[in-house]
């Protein structure tokens, strides 16, 4: 039985909406949820369809800093294998940069390849996106948070940056490939 394309699309969007709702309701009863998964960038047409008011905080970091950070981890943990025949640390710096930036299965390559799409969607849905340079966030976190709260339409909460509580649950960031 072939379904009408519009009915199928409406059903699919509702399926996604209910799945996401159930996912986050199982984790928290808080009215606002931040998901830091980079994977959302690959599904913006879907997420904007099931929640046209969804918000996307995009924090951009200087690419040079990211590469230096990745490379310092490589030298700190040379035993970690990266999908190649030659140990990754033995590749030239230029070859490593190419791998970091072009490998769409890597921590950097995948979000980097999605960045033009994210910026295009952010232009089209400018009220849904807040783009912030990580350097600005690091230098003036209080001001950055004030702008974020204002963008969200939420009352500002004064953060104590010297006493950040542990989260309610442990999130093992290393499980995220992208």
Residue ranges, per PLM feature:
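PAPS-dependent sulfotransferase catalytic core
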Residues: 1-19, 27, 167, 172
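PAPS-dependent sulfotransferase catalytic domain
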Residues: 31-159, 174
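Short, intrinsically disordered, charge-balanced linker/junction segments flanking boundaries
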Residues: 172-178
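Acidic/histidine-enriched alpha-helical segments
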Residues: 161-166
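Glycine-rich phosphate-binding loop used to anchor ATP phosphates in small-molecule kinases
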Residues: 12-43
């Amino acid at each position: 039985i072939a379904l009408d394309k519009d009915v199928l699309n409406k059903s699919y969007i509702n399926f996604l909406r209910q799945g996401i709702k159930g996912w986050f309701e199982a984790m928290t009863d808080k009215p606002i949820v931040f998901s830091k998964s980079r994977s959302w960038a690959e599904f913006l047409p879907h997420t904007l369809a099931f929640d046209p008011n969804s918000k996307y905080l995009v924090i951009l970091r200087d690419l040079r800093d990211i590469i230096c950070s990745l490379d310092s981890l490589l030298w700190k943990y040379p035993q970690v294998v990266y999908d190649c025949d030659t140990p990754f640390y033995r590749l030239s710096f230029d070859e490593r940069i190419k791998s970091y930036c072009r490998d769409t299965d890597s921590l950097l390559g995948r979000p980097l390849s999605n960045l033009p799409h994210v910026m295009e969607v952010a232009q089209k849905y400018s009220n849904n996106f807040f783009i912030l340079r990580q350097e600005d966030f690091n230098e003036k976190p209080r001001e950055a948070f004030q702008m974020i709260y204002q963008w969200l339409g939420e009352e500002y909460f004064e953060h104590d940056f010297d006493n950040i509580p542990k989260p309610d649950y442990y999130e093992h960031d290393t499980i995220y490939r992208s």
